[in-house]
Amino acid sequence: MSRALMIQGTGSNVGKSMLAAGLCRIARNRGLSVAPFKPQNMSNNAAVTADGGEIGRAQALQAMACGLEPHTDMNPVLLKPETETGSQVVVQGKRFTTVRARDYAKLKPQLMQAVLDSFKRLKAAHDLVIVEGAGSPAEVNLRNGDIANMGFAQASGTPVVLCGDIDRGGVIAQIVGTQAVMSAEDVALVRGFMINKFRGDPSLFDDGYKLIEQHTGWQGFGVIPWFADAGNLPAEDALDITTRTRDTGLHIVCLRLSRIANFDDMDPLAQEPGVRLTMLNAGEAIPGDADMVIIPGSKSTRGDLAYLRAQGWDLDLRAHLRRGGHVLGICGGYQMLGGSVADPEGVEGPAGTDEGLGLLDVETVMTGDKRLTRVAAIHAPSGTAFNGYEIHIGRTSGPDAARPFAVVNGQPEGAISGDGRVSGSYLHGMFRDDAFRAAWLAQFGVAQSVSYDATVQATLDALAAHLEGVMDIDALLDVRL
Protein backbone atom coordinates (compact mmCIF):
# COMPACT_ATOMS: atom_id res chain seq x y z
CA MET A 1 0.00 0.00 0.00
CA SER A 2 1.38 3.40 -0.97
CA ARG A 3 2.55 5.64 1.87
CA ALA A 4 3.82 9.18 2.36
CA LEU A 5 6.07 10.90 4.88
CA MET A 6 6.36 14.66 5.29
CA ILE A 7 9.50 16.47 6.46
CA GLN A 8 8.71 19.83 8.02
CA GLY A 9 11.19 22.23 9.60
CA THR A 10 11.41 24.57 12.54
CA GLY A 11 12.30 27.31 10.05
CA SER A 12 13.67 28.04 6.61
CA ASN A 13 17.09 26.69 5.61
CA VAL A 14 17.17 23.97 8.26
CA GLY A 15 18.04 21.40 5.58
CA LYS A 16 14.64 20.00 4.61
CA SER A 17 15.41 19.84 0.89
CA MET A 18 18.68 18.00 1.31
CA LEU A 19 17.24 15.59 3.88
CA ALA A 20 14.34 14.83 1.56
CA ALA A 21 16.79 14.15 -1.28
CA GLY A 22 18.81 11.83 0.96
CA LEU A 23 15.71 9.93 2.07
CA CYS A 24 14.61 9.61 -1.55
CA ARG A 25 17.95 8.03 -2.46
CA ILE A 26 17.80 5.71 0.58
CA ALA A 27 14.32 4.51 -0.37
CA ARG A 28 15.39 3.94 -3.95
CA ASN A 29 18.45 2.00 -2.79
CA ARG A 30 16.10 -0.21 -0.76
CA GLY A 31 14.13 -1.09 -3.86
CA LEU A 32 11.15 1.19 -3.30
CA SER A 33 9.48 3.19 -6.04
CA VAL A 34 9.74 6.65 -4.48
CA ALA A 35 8.87 10.18 -5.63
CA PRO A 36 9.41 13.66 -4.14
CA PHE A 37 6.66 16.18 -3.51
CA LYS A 38 6.56 19.77 -2.31
CA PRO A 39 3.06 21.32 -2.23
CA GLN A 40 4.27 24.90 -2.46
CA ASN A 41 7.73 26.25 -3.15
CA MET A 42 8.97 29.83 -3.41
CA SER A 43 11.99 30.13 -5.66
CA ASN A 44 13.25 31.76 -8.83
CA ASN A 45 15.47 28.73 -9.37
CA ALA A 46 13.27 26.58 -11.57
CA ALA A 47 13.79 23.41 -13.59
CA VAL A 48 12.05 22.68 -16.88
CA THR A 49 10.27 19.33 -16.85
CA ALA A 50 9.87 16.78 -19.63
CA ASP A 51 6.14 17.57 -19.74
CA GLY A 52 6.89 21.19 -20.62
CA GLY A 53 6.38 22.89 -17.28
CA GLU A 54 8.53 24.20 -14.44
CA ILE A 55 9.11 23.18 -10.84
CA GLY A 56 11.48 24.18 -8.06
CA ARG A 57 15.07 23.10 -8.66
CA ALA A 58 15.16 21.29 -5.30
CA GLN A 59 12.40 18.93 -6.45
CA ALA A 60 14.33 18.27 -9.67
CA LEU A 61 17.31 17.20 -7.55
CA GLN A 62 15.05 15.01 -5.40
CA ALA A 63 13.65 13.43 -8.57
CA MET A 64 17.22 12.65 -9.60
CA ALA A 65 17.73 11.00 -6.21
CA CYS A 66 14.67 8.84 -6.96
CA GLY A 67 15.90 7.94 -10.44
CA LEU A 68 12.97 9.82 -12.00
CA GLU A 69 12.50 12.54 -14.58
CA PRO A 70 11.22 15.75 -12.96
CA HIS A 71 7.44 16.17 -13.37
CA THR A 72 5.14 19.10 -12.67
CA ASP A 73 3.17 17.05 -10.14
CA MET A 74 6.24 17.03 -7.88
CA ASN A 75 5.80 20.77 -7.13
CA PRO A 76 2.27 21.83 -8.09
CA VAL A 77 2.51 25.40 -6.75
CA LEU A 78 5.63 27.45 -7.44
CA LEU A 79 5.82 31.09 -6.36
CA LYS A 80 8.38 33.15 -8.26
CA PRO A 81 8.98 36.53 -6.56
CA GLU A 82 8.96 39.48 -8.96
CA THR A 83 8.88 42.33 -6.43
CA GLU A 84 9.13 42.66 -2.66
CA THR A 85 5.37 42.17 -2.37
CA GLY A 86 4.33 40.24 -5.47
CA SER A 87 4.97 36.88 -7.11
CA GLN A 88 4.16 34.98 -10.25
CA VAL A 89 2.09 31.91 -9.38
CA VAL A 90 2.90 28.76 -11.36
CA VAL A 91 0.33 25.95 -11.01
CA GLN A 92 1.19 22.43 -12.16
CA GLY A 93 4.01 23.81 -14.24
CA LYS A 94 2.19 26.64 -16.01
CA ARG A 95 1.98 30.35 -15.30
CA PHE A 96 -1.36 30.96 -13.59
CA THR A 97 -1.35 34.57 -12.43
CA THR A 98 0.67 37.29 -10.72
CA VAL A 99 -0.54 38.27 -7.27
CA ARG A 100 0.35 40.53 -4.38
CA ALA A 101 1.26 38.78 -1.14
CA ARG A 102 -1.79 40.05 0.74
CA ASP A 103 -4.13 38.71 -1.98
CA TYR A 104 -2.53 35.28 -2.24
CA ALA A 105 -4.72 33.79 0.51
CA LYS A 106 -7.78 34.19 -1.72
CA LEU A 107 -6.28 31.71 -4.18
CA LYS A 108 -5.45 29.02 -1.64
CA PRO A 109 -8.69 26.99 -1.77
CA GLN A 110 -8.28 26.64 -5.53
CA LEU A 111 -4.57 25.90 -5.18
CA MET A 112 -5.17 23.26 -2.51
CA GLN A 113 -7.25 21.26 -4.97
CA ALA A 114 -4.41 21.34 -7.50
CA VAL A 115 -1.97 20.30 -4.77
CA LEU A 116 -4.10 17.34 -3.70
CA ASP A 117 -4.71 16.25 -7.30
CA SER A 118 -0.96 16.16 -8.00
CA PHE A 119 -0.24 14.38 -4.72
CA LYS A 120 -2.86 11.70 -5.38
CA ARG A 121 -1.39 10.99 -8.82
CA LEU A 122 2.12 10.59 -7.39
CA LYS A 123 0.94 8.44 -4.51
CA ALA A 124 -0.99 6.16 -6.85
CA ALA A 125 2.11 5.65 -9.00
CA HIS A 126 4.71 4.99 -6.27
CA ASP A 127 5.30 2.97 -3.10
CA LEU A 128 6.43 6.03 -1.14
CA VAL A 129 6.19 9.80 -1.50
CA ILE A 130 8.66 11.95 0.45
CA VAL A 131 6.97 15.31 1.05
CA GLU A 132 8.86 18.49 1.92
CA GLY A 133 7.19 21.33 3.78
CA ALA A 134 7.99 25.03 3.42
CA GLY A 135 9.22 27.40 6.09
CA SER A 136 7.81 26.29 9.43
CA PRO A 137 4.48 25.11 10.90
CA ALA A 138 5.28 27.39 13.85
CA GLU A 139 4.09 30.34 11.75
CA VAL A 140 0.58 29.75 13.07
CA ASN A 141 -0.56 33.18 11.88
CA LEU A 142 -0.46 31.60 8.40
CA ARG A 143 -2.18 28.36 9.41
CA ASN A 144 -5.63 29.32 8.13
CA GLY A 145 -5.76 28.19 4.50
CA ASP A 146 -2.25 26.71 4.66
CA ILE A 147 -1.33 24.46 1.74
CA ALA A 148 2.40 24.07 2.43
CA ASN A 149 2.67 22.46 5.87
CA MET A 150 0.04 21.28 8.35
CA GLY A 151 -2.85 22.32 6.14
CA PHE A 152 -1.63 19.90 3.51
CA ALA A 153 -0.76 17.21 6.08
CA GLN A 154 -4.30 17.35 7.50
CA ALA A 155 -5.97 17.35 4.09
CA SER A 156 -3.90 14.42 2.83
CA GLY A 157 -3.57 12.44 6.06
CA THR A 158 0.23 12.49 5.92
CA PRO A 159 2.39 11.91 9.03
CA VAL A 160 5.03 14.52 9.81
CA VAL A 161 8.58 14.46 11.14
CA LEU A 162 10.00 17.79 12.34
CA CYS A 163 13.58 18.83 11.56
CA GLY A 164 15.53 21.29 13.72
CA ASP A 165 18.83 23.04 12.88
CA ILE A 166 21.32 22.92 15.74
CA ASP A 167 23.94 24.92 13.83
CA ARG A 168 21.98 28.16 14.26
CA GLY A 169 21.55 27.51 18.00
CA GLY A 170 18.53 27.05 20.23
CA VAL A 171 17.38 23.78 18.71
CA ILE A 172 15.63 22.65 21.91
CA ALA A 173 13.53 25.81 21.89
CA GLN A 174 12.98 25.42 18.12
CA ILE A 175 11.34 22.02 18.49
CA VAL A 176 9.65 22.38 21.88
CA GLY A 177 8.44 25.87 20.96
CA THR A 178 7.04 24.68 17.64
CA GLN A 179 4.97 22.07 19.43
CA ALA A 180 3.81 24.66 21.99
CA VAL A 181 2.24 26.97 19.40
CA MET A 182 0.65 24.27 17.23
CA SER A 183 -2.94 23.15 17.66
CA ALA A 184 -3.63 19.79 19.27
CA GLU A 185 -4.98 18.50 15.95
CA ASP A 186 -1.74 19.38 14.16
CA VAL A 187 0.48 18.05 16.95
CA ALA A 188 -1.30 14.71 16.58
CA LEU A 189 0.14 14.34 13.07
CA VAL A 190 3.76 14.72 14.21
CA ARG A 191 5.50 11.39 14.74
CA GLY A 192 8.94 12.57 15.76
CA PHE A 193 11.90 14.85 15.18
CA MET A 194 15.47 14.91 13.96
CA ILE A 195 18.37 17.25 14.60
CA ASN A 196 20.33 18.48 11.59
CA LYS A 197 23.74 20.15 11.02
CA PHE A 198 25.52 19.04 14.19
CA ARG A 199 29.22 19.94 14.38
CA GLY A 200 31.53 18.04 16.72
CA ASP A 201 30.81 15.06 18.97
CA PRO A 202 27.06 14.19 18.79
CA SER A 203 27.21 12.47 22.19
CA LEU A 204 27.56 15.92 23.75
CA PHE A 205 23.93 16.51 22.82
CA ASP A 206 22.58 13.32 24.42
CA ASP A 207 21.01 15.17 27.34
CA GLY A 208 19.45 17.79 25.07
CA TYR A 209 18.04 15.06 22.84
CA LYS A 210 16.40 13.39 25.82
CA LEU A 211 14.99 16.73 26.99
CA ILE A 212 13.26 17.21 23.64
CA GLU A 213 11.80 13.70 23.82
CA GLN A 214 10.57 14.32 27.38
CA HIS A 215 9.05 17.75 26.67
CA THR A 216 7.34 16.76 23.42
CA GLY A 217 6.63 13.06 23.81
CA TRP A 218 7.93 12.66 20.26
CA GLN A 219 10.34 10.00 19.08
CA GLY A 220 13.81 11.13 18.05
CA PHE A 221 15.06 9.69 14.76
CA GLY A 222 18.66 10.84 15.05
CA VAL A 223 21.26 13.60 15.25
CA ILE A 224 22.70 14.29 11.81
CA PRO A 225 26.28 15.59 11.64
CA TRP A 226 27.17 18.39 9.24
CA PHE A 227 27.38 17.02 5.68
CA ALA A 228 30.58 18.49 4.30
CA ASP A 229 29.86 17.61 0.67
CA ALA A 230 26.56 19.53 0.53
CA GLY A 231 28.24 22.15 -1.66
CA ASN A 232 28.52 19.58 -4.46
CA LEU A 233 24.74 19.56 -4.84
CA PRO A 234 22.88 22.19 -6.90
CA ALA A 235 22.19 25.34 -4.91
CA GLU A 236 18.58 25.90 -3.84
CA ASP A 237 19.13 29.47 -2.69
CA ALA A 238 21.31 32.13 -4.32
CA LEU A 239 23.11 32.62 -1.01
CA ASP A 240 24.10 28.93 -1.11
CA ILE A 241 26.46 29.66 -4.01
CA THR A 242 29.60 30.95 -2.39
CA THR A 243 32.83 32.39 -3.70
CA ARG A 244 35.43 29.68 -4.31
CA THR A 245 38.62 31.24 -3.00
CA ARG A 246 41.23 29.45 -5.09
CA ASP A 247 44.46 31.34 -5.58
CA THR A 248 44.76 30.54 -9.27
CA GLY A 249 42.58 29.67 -12.21
CA LEU A 250 40.26 31.40 -14.63
CA HIS A 251 38.62 34.16 -12.58
CA ILE A 252 34.88 34.20 -13.29
CA VAL A 253 32.75 36.84 -11.59
CA CYS A 254 28.97 36.39 -11.40
CA LEU A 255 26.83 39.41 -10.50
CA ARG A 256 24.44 38.51 -7.68
CA LEU A 257 21.37 40.37 -8.95
CA SER A 258 18.50 41.24 -6.62
CA ARG A 259 16.10 38.94 -8.55
CA ILE A 260 18.69 36.42 -9.69
CA ALA A 261 17.09 33.36 -11.28
CA ASN A 262 18.34 29.89 -12.24
CA PHE A 263 21.56 30.65 -10.43
CA ASP A 264 22.48 26.97 -10.32
CA ASP A 265 23.98 27.66 -13.75
CA MET A 266 27.06 28.56 -11.70
CA ASP A 267 27.31 25.27 -9.78
CA PRO A 268 29.25 23.29 -12.41
CA LEU A 269 31.75 26.11 -12.85
CA ALA A 270 32.25 26.31 -9.09
CA GLN A 271 33.25 22.62 -9.06
CA GLU A 272 36.01 23.04 -11.64
CA PRO A 273 39.52 23.11 -10.09
CA GLY A 274 40.70 25.42 -12.88
CA VAL A 275 38.05 28.04 -12.12
CA ARG A 276 37.97 30.68 -9.40
CA LEU A 277 34.34 31.80 -9.00
CA THR A 278 33.43 35.06 -7.28
CA MET A 279 29.79 35.79 -6.49
CA LEU A 280 29.74 39.59 -6.43
CA ASN A 281 27.50 41.20 -3.83
CA ALA A 282 25.86 44.62 -3.81
CA GLY A 283 28.36 47.42 -3.29
CA GLU A 284 31.37 45.39 -4.44
CA ALA A 285 33.31 46.42 -7.53
CA ILE A 286 34.11 44.01 -10.33
CA PRO A 287 37.70 42.91 -9.56
CA GLY A 288 40.42 44.11 -11.88
CA ASP A 289 41.76 40.58 -12.34
CA ALA A 290 38.44 39.13 -13.55
CA ASP A 291 38.73 37.20 -16.81
CA MET A 292 35.00 36.69 -17.38
CA VAL A 293 31.92 38.41 -15.95
CA ILE A 294 28.62 36.55 -16.11
CA ILE A 295 25.32 38.41 -15.86
CA PRO A 296 22.92 35.63 -14.83
CA GLY A 297 19.20 35.16 -15.29
CA SER A 298 16.71 37.45 -13.56
CA LYS A 299 13.02 37.29 -12.71
CA SER A 300 12.81 41.05 -13.32
CA THR A 301 15.10 42.12 -16.14
CA ARG A 302 14.33 45.84 -16.08
CA GLY A 303 14.35 45.93 -12.28
CA ASP A 304 17.71 44.20 -12.10
CA LEU A 305 19.09 46.40 -14.87
CA ALA A 306 18.40 49.38 -12.60
CA TYR A 307 19.89 47.43 -9.66
CA LEU A 308 23.02 46.68 -11.70
CA ARG A 309 23.47 50.37 -12.49
CA ALA A 310 22.90 51.34 -8.86
CA GLN A 311 25.93 49.20 -7.92
CA GLY A 312 28.07 50.91 -10.57
CA TRP A 313 28.50 47.60 -12.38
CA ASP A 314 27.63 49.15 -15.76
CA LEU A 315 30.76 51.30 -15.53
CA ASP A 316 32.78 48.39 -14.16
CA LEU A 317 31.76 46.22 -17.12
CA ARG A 318 33.08 48.76 -19.62
CA ALA A 319 36.35 49.04 -17.69
CA HIS A 320 36.55 45.23 -17.58
CA LEU A 321 36.17 45.06 -21.37
CA ARG A 322 38.81 47.76 -21.88
CA ARG A 323 41.20 45.54 -19.90
CA GLY A 324 40.54 42.72 -22.37
CA GLY A 325 37.96 40.84 -20.30
CA HIS A 326 34.94 38.88 -21.51
CA VAL A 327 31.23 39.12 -20.65
CA LEU A 328 28.47 36.49 -20.92
CA GLY A 329 24.80 37.25 -20.35
CA ILE A 330 22.40 34.37 -19.70
CA CYS A 331 18.66 34.84 -20.29
CA GLY A 332 17.77 38.06 -18.45
CA GLY A 333 21.47 38.91 -18.44
CA TYR A 334 21.48 38.56 -22.22
CA GLN A 335 18.51 40.94 -22.47
CA MET A 336 20.36 43.52 -20.35
CA LEU A 337 23.38 43.47 -22.68
CA GLY A 338 21.41 44.93 -25.60
CA GLY A 339 20.48 48.48 -26.50
CA SER A 340 17.02 48.42 -24.92
CA VAL A 341 14.49 46.30 -23.05
CA ALA A 342 10.89 47.16 -23.94
CA ASP A 343 7.85 45.90 -22.04
CA PRO A 344 4.90 47.53 -23.84
CA GLU A 345 2.29 45.27 -22.21
CA GLY A 346 3.66 45.50 -18.67
CA VAL A 347 4.37 41.77 -18.52
CA GLU A 348 7.17 42.06 -15.95
CA GLY A 349 6.05 45.25 -14.25
CA PRO A 350 5.02 48.77 -15.27
CA ALA A 351 4.89 49.15 -19.06
CA GLY A 352 7.82 51.03 -20.55
CA THR A 353 11.24 50.82 -22.14
CA ASP A 354 14.64 50.97 -20.45
CA GLU A 355 18.01 51.59 -22.02
CA GLY A 356 20.21 48.51 -21.95
CA LEU A 357 23.94 48.27 -21.36
CA GLY A 358 24.67 48.65 -25.08
CA LEU A 359 27.32 45.94 -25.13
CA LEU A 360 25.50 43.90 -27.79
CA ASP A 361 23.75 45.33 -30.84
CA VAL A 362 20.39 43.72 -30.10
CA GLU A 363 17.03 44.84 -28.71
CA THR A 364 14.54 42.94 -26.52
CA VAL A 365 10.75 43.15 -26.45
CA MET A 366 8.89 41.43 -23.61
CA THR A 367 5.87 39.38 -24.68
CA GLY A 368 3.15 37.61 -22.73
CA ASP A 369 3.96 34.14 -24.00
CA LYS A 370 6.54 32.25 -21.96
CA ARG A 371 8.99 29.87 -23.59
CA LEU A 372 9.51 26.71 -21.53
CA THR A 373 11.40 23.95 -23.28
CA ARG A 374 14.38 21.65 -23.15
CA VAL A 375 16.68 22.02 -26.15
CA ALA A 376 19.47 20.23 -27.97
CA ALA A 377 21.88 22.87 -29.27
CA ILE A 378 25.21 23.35 -31.00
CA HIS A 379 27.68 25.90 -29.65
CA ALA A 380 28.37 28.00 -32.73
CA PRO A 381 32.01 28.97 -32.01
CA SER A 382 33.19 25.42 -31.22
CA GLY A 383 30.65 23.19 -32.98
CA THR A 384 30.03 21.32 -29.71
CA ALA A 385 26.62 19.69 -29.25
CA PHE A 386 25.03 20.19 -25.83
CA ASN A 387 21.74 20.15 -23.94
CA GLY A 388 20.09 23.02 -22.10
CA TYR A 389 16.71 24.62 -21.55
CA GLU A 390 14.85 27.88 -22.11
CA ILE A 391 12.60 29.51 -19.52
CA HIS A 392 11.86 33.12 -20.41
CA ILE A 393 9.54 35.75 -21.75
CA GLY A 394 10.74 38.21 -24.37
CA ARG A 395 12.30 37.98 -27.81
CA THR A 396 15.70 39.43 -28.74
CA SER A 397 16.93 40.41 -32.21
CA GLY A 398 19.44 42.68 -33.90
CA PRO A 399 22.64 42.76 -35.98
CA ASP A 400 24.79 40.89 -33.44
CA ALA A 401 22.30 38.00 -33.55
CA ALA A 402 23.76 37.29 -37.00
CA ARG A 403 26.73 35.92 -35.02
CA PRO A 404 24.80 33.37 -32.91
CA PHE A 405 26.00 31.88 -29.67
CA ALA A 406 24.29 28.59 -30.52
CA VAL A 407 22.13 26.87 -33.11
CA VAL A 408 18.85 25.27 -31.95
CA ASN A 409 16.77 23.23 -34.40
CA GLY A 410 18.66 24.83 -37.25
CA GLN A 411 17.87 28.34 -36.01
CA PRO A 412 20.38 30.87 -34.61
CA GLU A 413 20.18 31.51 -30.86
CA GLY A 414 21.87 34.25 -28.89
CA ALA A 415 24.42 36.78 -30.08
CA ILE A 416 28.15 37.52 -30.06
CA SER A 417 29.76 40.95 -30.44
CA GLY A 418 32.00 41.76 -33.39
CA ASP A 419 35.17 41.41 -31.31
CA GLY A 420 33.95 38.13 -29.80
CA ARG A 421 34.31 39.28 -26.19
CA VAL A 422 30.61 39.81 -25.35
CA SER A 423 28.14 36.94 -25.70
CA GLY A 424 24.52 36.41 -24.81
CA SER A 425 22.21 33.40 -24.80
CA TYR A 426 18.79 32.39 -23.51
CA LEU A 427 20.04 28.87 -22.77
CA HIS A 428 20.23 27.75 -19.16
CA GLY A 429 21.87 24.53 -18.03
CA MET A 430 24.64 24.61 -20.63
CA PHE A 431 27.45 24.49 -18.07
CA ARG A 432 25.95 21.31 -16.65
CA ASP A 433 26.76 19.63 -19.96
CA ASP A 434 30.34 18.35 -19.63
CA ALA A 435 31.08 18.61 -23.37
CA PHE A 436 29.94 22.23 -23.59
CA ARG A 437 31.74 23.22 -20.40
CA ALA A 438 34.96 21.67 -21.73
CA ALA A 439 34.67 23.55 -25.03
CA TRP A 440 33.78 26.84 -23.35
CA LEU A 441 36.61 26.64 -20.82
CA ALA A 442 39.08 25.63 -23.54
CA GLN A 443 38.59 29.09 -25.10
CA PHE A 444 40.36 30.44 -22.01
CA GLY A 445 43.03 27.75 -21.84
CA VAL A 446 41.36 25.86 -18.98
CA ALA A 447 40.91 22.09 -19.05
CA GLN A 448 37.54 20.75 -17.84
CA SER A 449 38.18 17.99 -15.30
CA VAL A 450 34.86 17.33 -13.53
CA SER A 451 31.92 15.20 -14.65
CA TYR A 452 29.20 17.27 -13.04
CA ASP A 453 26.23 14.89 -13.09
CA ALA A 454 28.46 12.04 -11.91
CA THR A 455 29.60 14.25 -9.03
CA VAL A 456 25.99 14.99 -8.06
CA GLN A 457 25.03 11.31 -8.23
CA ALA A 458 28.03 10.33 -6.11
CA THR A 459 27.15 13.05 -3.59
CA LEU A 460 23.57 11.77 -3.34
CA ASP A 461 24.95 8.30 -2.62
CA ALA A 462 27.29 9.76 0.01
CA LEU A 463 24.38 11.69 1.56
CA ALA A 464 22.30 8.52 1.76
CA ALA A 465 25.15 6.66 3.46
CA HIS A 466 25.66 9.63 5.81
CA LEU A 467 22.01 9.49 6.93
CA GLU A 468 21.91 5.69 7.14
CA GLY A 469 24.83 5.79 9.56
CA VAL A 470 23.27 8.14 12.12
CA MET A 471 19.48 7.80 11.85
CA ASP A 472 16.94 5.12 12.65
CA ILE A 473 15.96 4.82 9.01
CA ASP A 474 13.93 1.63 9.46
CA ALA A 475 11.68 3.34 12.00
CA LEU A 476 11.51 6.55 9.97
CA LEU A 477 10.40 4.84 6.76
CA ASP A 478 7.83 2.87 8.75
CA VAL A 479 6.16 6.01 10.16
CA ARG A 480 2.43 6.10 9.63
CA LEU A 481 -0.65 7.56 11.30
Curated annotation (Swiss-Prot):
Belongs to the CobB/CobQ family. CobQ subfamily. GO terms for molecular function: ABC-type vitamin B12 transporter activity; catalytic activity. This is Cobyric acid synthase. Catalyzes amidations at positions B, D, E, and G on adenosylcobyrinic A,C-diamide. NH(2) groups are provided by glutamine, and one molecule of ATP is hydrogenolyzed for each amidation. SUPFAM superfamilies: Class I glutamine amidotransferase-like, P-loop containing nucleoside triphosphate hydrolases. The active site is at C331 (nucleophile), H428. Gene3D superfamilies: 3.40.50.880, P-loop containing nucleotide triphosphate hydrolases. The gene is cobQ. Keywords: Cobalamin biosynthesis, Glutamine amidotransferase. GO terms for biological process: cobalamin biosynthetic process. It comes from Jannaschia sp. (strain CCS1). InterPro entries: Class_I_gatase-like, CobQ/CobB/MinD/ParA_Nub-bd_dom, CobQ_GATase1, CobQ_N, CobQ_synth, GATase_3, P-loop_NTPase. Pathway: Cofactor biosynthesis; adenosylcobalamin biosynthesis. Residues 249-436 form the GATase cobBQ-type domain. The keyword Ion transport does not apply. It holds the Pfam family GATase_3. The keyword Methyltransferase does not apply. PROSITE patterns: GATASE_COBBQ.
